[in-house]
Swiss-Prot record:
It comes from Klebsiella aerogenes (Enterobacter aerogenes). GO terms for biological process: L-methionine salvage from methylthioadenosine. It comes from the Bacteria. Its EC number is 3.1.3.77. Keywords: Amino-acid biosynthesis, Hydrolase, Magnesium, Metal-binding, Methionine biosynthesis. This is Enolase-phosphatase E1. Bifunctional enzyme that catalyzes the enolization of 2,3-diketo-5-methylthiopentyl-1-phosphate (DK-MTP-1-P) into the intermediate 2-hydroxy-3-keto-5-methylthiopentenyl-1-phosphate (HK-MTPenyl-1-P), which is then dephosphorylated to form the acireductone 1,2-dihydroxy-3-keto-5-methylthiopentene (DHK-MTPene).
Length: 26
């Protein structure tokens, strides 16, 4: 859910990948 919110705010795939990597570094 957080990733979706961040994606909506950022609106950038690059930032989404970065956030996803930070939230889910697995």
């Amino acid at each position: 859910m957080i990733x979706a919110i961040v994606t909506d705010i950022e609106g950038t795939t690059s930032d989404t990948x970065f956030v996803x990597n930070v939230l889910f570094p697995y």
